Each structure stands twice: as C-alpha cells, then as structure tokens.
Amino acid sequence: ANIGEIDILINNAGYLVKNNFDKLSHEDLLKSYQINVIGIMQAVQVIIPKMNPNGSHIVNISSMGGFQGSVKFPGLTAYSTSKAALCSFTELFAEEYKDSGIKMNCLCLGAVQTEMLEEAFPGFEAPHSPEEMASFIYTFATTQGDFMNGKIIPVSQSTP
C-alpha cells in the first residue's frame, strides 16, 4: 500500500520477562532487546523517508524502569535495561536528525493497568487505565513535537 507523509509515529512495544539476572537465558535477553529496542530502531529506519520534513514527531514509549534514577525492581533486568537503551536511542536520534524536521521524544511510563503489569506485579492496582494513557500519549504526540526534541520524560504517579 502506498501511504503519504507521516506526521506522527508512536512506538509502543513491550516485552517483559521477570527473572533474576543469573537466571536470564540468552533467549530472554535477545527477545527483550529485539522487541523493546531493535524492532523499534528498525521500524524508524524504514519510516524516516516517509516522515514529514516540515515537522513530524516520533514518540517512543519506555518505562520508569528504564528512567535513570528511578526505583528499580528485582527480576526486571532485561526489561529495564532494554527500556533504558530506548531512552538513549531517543537522545542520539534527536541529535543526529535535529536539522531534518523530525523530532523524537521518549515517554517513560509508570504503572498502567495492563496484562503485562498484572503478570509482573500480581494484585497491584495502577492509577491509570490503558485508555487514559493512550489519550495522554496521543495529546503529547500531536501537540509537543514543536516544543521539544530528544527529551526523556517521566510520566508517573507511582512506580511500578
């Protein structure tokens, strides 16, 4: 299918394996990084030529687990480090493409009541539903690209 210029791209991919560091398999690490970082980077490579050069915005969805200085949880090494890598990618891309008209920012989400959260933290009740967070992300993506680039932004009332 032929698509026109893209104004907004939201990268929301997540894979979480909960296991102590010494128990993580090679496959656990590969899958975490493939989904949480490499797949996103490859998607961006494909999309760059289609992005609107007169102002477009890429929003990466990371996690408070990958936000420097945040509370860390045992068993989330693969997840949190891969989400931290996504934050670093955001900063590097923003610098490399700063004159292109394409902006990239990263939202580090705290707890949202998803299946992934329930599996990682059974019984934990998050302050936001997926629908509420989707509304926030949409508003951010459509209104903030003109104001910031390369920013890593915590979006959390609680952690996890």
PLM regions with names:
Residues 12-17:
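Conserved NAD(P)H cofactor-binding loop of Rossmann-fold oxidoreductase domains
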Residues 20-21, 28-30:
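Substrate-binding pocket helix/loop in short-chain dehydrogenase/reductase
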Residues 44, 79-82:
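Active-site helix of classical SDR
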Residues 44-45, 91:
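A short, exposed helix-loop element centered on a Lys and neighboring polar residues
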Residues 51, 71, 91-102:
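Active-site-adjacent segment of SDR/Rossmann-fold oxidoreductases
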Residues 63:
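Residue(s) in the substrate-gating loop at a strand-loop-helix junction
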Residues 106-107, 122-160:
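C-terminal helical subdomain
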